[in-house]
Structure formats: C-alpha cells, structure tokens
Design a protein with these regions (language model features):
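Oxyanion-binding/catalytic loops of NTP- or PPi-dependent enzymes
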Residues: 1-87, 92-99, 104-113, 118, ...
Length: 528
C-alpha cells in the first residue's frame, strides 16, 4: 500500500508525519529539523525558497518573504483581521478578485492558497525524499474554529500542491488521536491548542478506540504572533515618537523588532530576566544608526501578555459550558502548539484545570502524528487493504450554519457542535406576491443578525410558480461532509424545481482557478 502523510500546516511552523510499519515517524529535513517554518521567500525571478532557508532570508528580503499567511487565508479583504495584518507585516497585502487578500511580491500577486501550496509541496517533497517514493495522499489539519471558507481554501492549497487531500481534520482532534491511540481509556479529555496564530480548545469523550468530540471553541486570531506583538508594543513604547515613526515606516525594522520580541518571549521561560538588543534599528538626527536595548523581566512579560492568556480561558469556559462539563470532569489534559512551552501558559493551564498535562506528548509534533494516523486509516479503507488502526473519529462543526431570512435575521439549520457528517432540512415560503426566484444566502456563526456572521456564499433558485406570498413552499437542505465543508440545496416542494451549491467560499477560488494554478506553479527547488 502506498504511504499517506499527515500534515500539520501551522501558522509559524509545519510538521509532516507518516505511519510506517505501524510506527509514527516525524519526517525531518536534510539537517535533521523536524519542524519546518511556514515561510516562503520569493526572489526576483527566482524559484521560491521554503522552510529554514527562507527564514534566513527574512532580514535580507523582508518584503519578499511571507510568514504567518495562515492567519490571512479564507478571510475577506475588509475583515478586521486583514486590516490589522496590513499594519503589522512587512510584505504587501492587496485585494484580490474575490474580495480575498493576496500577497504582492515584486511584480507578481499571489493568492494565499498559492503561498500555502508552496509550503505543502515542500513538505510533500521532504516526505518523498524520506520514503524514497512518490507521495500523493494526505490528511491536512486546520484549527477547530476555522470556518468553511478557511477549510476550503486549505483544501484548495493541497490540491494546488498536487496532493489528493483525503480529509481536512481539526488540530485538537488529531492531537487526541495521537494521545489516546491503542490505550484502553474511558474519560473526558481537553485539548488546549495554542499555536503561532490560533487558539482552540476541544472537549472529547474517549472510549477505547472511539474519539467523540463533544464541543469545540476557538479564536482564529489568537496565538504566539499576538504575544510577540504585545512585546513589540512594549518595546515601541520605550522609543521616542520620531523613532516609533521610523520603525513603522520600515519593513526591515519591524521585522527586526518582531524577531527580537519572539526571542525574548522564549528566553523568559528559562530565565527571570532577559536583555533585548536590536542593532541598527533607527537613525538619529545625524543619520547614524542606533541600537535598541532594554531589559525585560519575567514578571513584566507576564503582565504584558496576561490579557491574551485570559482570553484563552474565556474560550475554555465556552467549550466546557457547551460540553456540560467543569474543569474537574476532565480526566486528561493534552497541550498542543509551540506556545504551550511557555512557562506562563503551562502554569496558567495547570491552575485552570487543576491537573498536570499528559506526559509523552510533544506539543509541536502530536497534531501531525494524529493526522498521519487518520491518513493511514482513510487510505486503508479506500483501498480495502484493512490497514490502519480501526479508530472511530466523531468530530463536530464548530459554528452554527443558517440562511438569511426576511428582516435580515439568520435562521439556523445546523447548530454548532453538531456531529459531522450531518444533514438537515427546513421549509420556508416566499415573501412577496408573484415571486419568481429566491436568493439563498448562507452564513456561519452565532449572531442573530445575518450580517454579523460570516457569509459563506449564495445562490438563486429560479422558476418559481406565480402565486401569492406564502403559497410557494421551498425546502432548504444543508449537508456537511467529513471535512466540515458545506453543501446546500433548495427545492420548490410542489414542482421539484431545484438549485444546489457546494458552497464556494465568497473569498475563494473556482475549481478552474485551482486547476490552472496546479498546472502553472513551479515547485522546483523549494529548498529541500
């Protein structure tokens, strides 16, 4: 049987794993690194460089080196998150054809799907070099709170990279697979997942080989990048107004400060005080370069980032309430993501749940290992080989789904934390006399008003029979597949006139665009 890989496509770093001879193996690069920066650097007319080599180019090519792109994918250009990113990254973010953010580098504009595809193709190349044979199949993980737009954009990126994406699964769920595999457990588990760009908490019931997600909650714009930004803001506050303006105008200076802030954050898990120094950050009135220096203690750092830590527990409260659990009901605590190595996070999480996290779980690698387990299961089932572990994974949809109705309200058809795959239907009527068509607008979120939720897409059911308002009955069917991706059908109940849509993200690419990008992109020399 061919191999199928599991990919944790992270904001800061990515990991790729495989199950070989019944054992999980995390795949290294040529230098032995098992985590690979999700960084893509574009030179003038050159092939892009990915991974650790790309990180080495960040200072030399700040406007051509793209990082943290996962925070942007699947969002609308005018969203709060994109507006915030435009002011914090050194590369250019520009609006695309579908109101999607794109990256302009030198004389070319790239979709976020292309950026992620370069990272995925790099990881696929590492796997092929490691295994000595072509790799075609993969399971890719996403944050549990990713919406339909973001999930589809990630699947599109996998297809552009030449992968057959067997499944998109949630990161905390993948982590639980790796944690509980082959162990006779019957307990509730909490997976606290704080990565570089996102935070998720999932509550699961593990019963032998059955993994049932009971609830999930998250914040797709809360992660290590925000902790770095908080330290950067502290550093900026120690500069004069003129020097602050210089830093904000200079992509190179902002990048230097970001990397210094990130290093200070890491240092303070091991020492009580660190000294931050950034050479050549600004220029004085005579044009001479000046360094930035400042001391930062662990106590100061904890005070700076406390609001961010508190936000994670507000999300935890939400997930536990939805699961009808308390922290004391949790029998196992799994911590995932590089930020959980931070001392303040470890102490705060242990205090909140009243227990220590599970040992033997590498927070950087566990998601990828879980994805590899699921990849082997799915490929074995698809090919009828009987391979895999025989585990049953029951996941949920993280946010409610519904349609816009008269008055601008959102009528929910599928509630959040519903087990997937799932489907449902609901009957509606026309709202005007002689109405010949109806527009179905699909939204995801918990707000009562449709405009306050995330719009996933729309389609029109035409050819309705002429009748007074309320006489024509329309049945709307919702279906969510195993990837958490939405399909919607509307049908006039009497005539059978129907229209259907596999919701294409309003900010996403068409199937034809994905196909063209897959054929056009040059994946040679990505820096394996």
């Amino acid at each position: 049987m061919p191999y199928a890989i599991g990919i944790d496509l992270g904001t800061s770093n990515s990991v790729v794993s495989v199950i070989r001879n019944g054992t999980a193996e995390v795949i290294p690069d040529a230098d032995g690194n098992r985590t690979h920066p999700s960084v893509v650097s574009f030179g003038h007319g050159q092939n892009p460089i990915v991974g650790h080599k790309a990180v080495g180019l960040m200072n030399l090519n700040p406007q051509g080196t793209v990082y943290s792109s996962k925070r942007l994918i699947g969002r609308a250009t005018d969203s709060e998150e994109i507006v915030r990113a435009v002011n914090s990254v050194p590369y250019d973010i520009v609006p695309g054809d579908h109101n999607d953010p794109r990256i302009r580098v030198h004389d070319r504009v790239y979709t976020l799907q292309e950026i992620s595809a370069h990272v995925l193709r790099y990881l696929r190349g590492l796997a092929e070099n490691y295994l000595g044979e072509p790799v075609q199949h993969a399971v890719i993980t996403v944050p549990a709170y990713f919406n339909d737009n973001q999930r589809q954009a990630t699947r599109d990126a996998g297809e552009i990279a030449g992968l057959e994406v067997l499944r998109i699964i949630n990161e905390p769920t993948a982590a639980s697979l790796a944690y509980g595999l082959g162990q006779d457990r019957d307990e509730y588990a909490a997976v606290y997942d704080l990565g570089g760009g996102t935070f998720d908490i999932s509550i699961l019931r593990i019963m032998g080989d059955v993994f049932e997600v009971v609830s999930t909650a998250g914040d797709t714009y809360l992660g290590g990048d925000d902790f770095d930004q908080a330290v950067m803001d502290y550093m900026l506050a120690h500069l004069s107004e003129e020097y602050q303006r210089q830093v904000r105008r200079s992509p190179s200076a902002r990048l230097k400060m970001r990397r210094a802030a990130e290093q200070a954050k890491r240092d303070l898990s091991d020492v009580e005080e660190t000294r931050i120094k950034v050479d050549g950050l600004v220029k004085d009135e005579r044009g001479y370069e000046q360094a930035f220096t400042s001391a930062l203690t662990r106590i100061q750092y904890n005070q700076i980032v406390f609001p961010l830590v508190k936000r994670t527990f507000e999300v935890c409260d939400e997930a536990l309430t939805a699961a009808r659990c308390t922290p004391g009901d949790i029998g196992a605590l799994v911590m995932v993501g590089g930020m959980t190595r931070s001392l303040i996070i470890q102490e705060a999480v242990e205090n909140y749940f009243g227990r220590e996290p599970a040992i033997g779980v590498n927070p950087d690698e566990v998601v990828s290992v879980g994805a590899a387990i699921q990849a082997e299961n799915l490929l074995g089932a698809m090919q009828g080989s009987g391979g895999g572990t025989g585990t049953l994974l029951i996941d949920v949809t993280p946010q409610s789904l519904g349609i816009a109705t008269v008055g601008g309200f959102c009528e929910r058809l599928i509630e959040r934390n519903s087990a997937i795959p799932t489907g449902t239907s609901k009957r509606f009527t026309t709202s005007a006399d002689g109405q010949s068509e109806v527009k179905i607008e699909v939204f995801q979120g918990e707000a009562r008003m449709a405009a306050d939720n995330e719009k996933l897409g729309e389609f029109i059911l035409q050819g309705l029979r002429p009748a007074p308002r309320g006489d024509v009955k329309i049945i709307v069917y919702f279906d969510i597949d195993g990837d958490g991706i939405v399909n919607v059908t509307a049908e006039e109940s009497e005539t059978g006139q129907a229209a259907a849509i596999r919701i294409e993200a309003s900010t996403g690419l068409s199937a034809e665009e994905v196909k063209d990008l897959r054929e056009d992109l040059n994946f040679d020399n990505l820096g394996f």
